[in-house]
């Protein structure tokens, strides 16, 4: 039997989506051995398996690196099993002392990751339609978890004096971009008598926009 129990909640079967802005305000746990994560998995994992389904790690933290914050993507081509995953890293001195907003901006063309509105990791879609490189045109669901130990979180052991460990989540917000009218018809009529020419250019004044 295991000495520790990890906790997870997810939206599988309840909420999945493609593209948008995802904001999660959270305070991370202290202690060597903790491994909190805010991430997403492709809802087709049951049929195509991992990593072809795609994985987006909005935030990962390991307790032995107090200030380190990671963001990653995993696909069939780019994943930790092959040691080819695409990963961003930054430091946040108050990650375990204060709440911060961890964000993902997901479009058909890129994934961009933020902490408190500050971007620190960007992945551009240069797959040319290859789903093994970019499975992120399919719906994903959200996962919030606090693991204890494991290959990464437990790489330097577990500090039993830090229990109980808690990852506190204030909110999870998802925003979808609305469709905007991009075609605007403009007619600009000019009285050509109001034309002035000098050494720097031609200036036309007066007119009506309709």
Predicted features by range, described:
Residues 195-210:
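Aromatic-rich carbohydrate-binding modules that target alpha-glucans
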Residues 1-180:
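GH16 jelly-roll
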Residues 181-187, 197-199:
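Short coil/turn motif common to extracellular beta-sandwich-like domains
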Residues 44, 188-195:
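Short amphipathic, basic-aromatic surface patches that mediate peripheral association
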């Amino acid at each position: 039997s295991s000495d520790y129990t990890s906790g997870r909640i997810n939206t599988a079967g309840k909420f999945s989506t493609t593209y948008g802005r995802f904001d999660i305000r959270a305070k991370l746990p202290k202690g060597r051995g903790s491994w909190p994560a805010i991430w997403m998995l492709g809802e087709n994992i049951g049929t195509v398996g991992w990593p072809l389904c795609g994985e987006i790690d909005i935030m990962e933290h390991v307790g032995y690196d107090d200030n380190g914050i990671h963001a990653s993507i995993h696909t069939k081509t780019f994943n930790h099993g092959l040691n080819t995953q695409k990963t961003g890293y930054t430091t946040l001195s108050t990650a375990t002392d204060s709440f911060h907003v961890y964000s993902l901006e997901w479009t058909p063309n890129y994934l961009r990751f933020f902490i408190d509105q500050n971007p620190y990791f960007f992945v551009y879609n240069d797959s040319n339609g290859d789903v093994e490189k970019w499975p992120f045109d399919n719906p994903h669901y959200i996962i919030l978890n606090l693991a204890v130990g494991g290959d990464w979180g437990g790489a330097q052991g577990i500090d039993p004096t830090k229990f109980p460990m808690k990852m506190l989540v204030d909110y999870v917000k998802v925003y979808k971009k609305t469709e905007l009218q991009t075609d605007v018809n403009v007619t600009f009529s000019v009285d050509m008598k109001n034309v002035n020419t000098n050494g720097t250019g031609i200036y036309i004044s007066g007119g009506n926009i309709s």
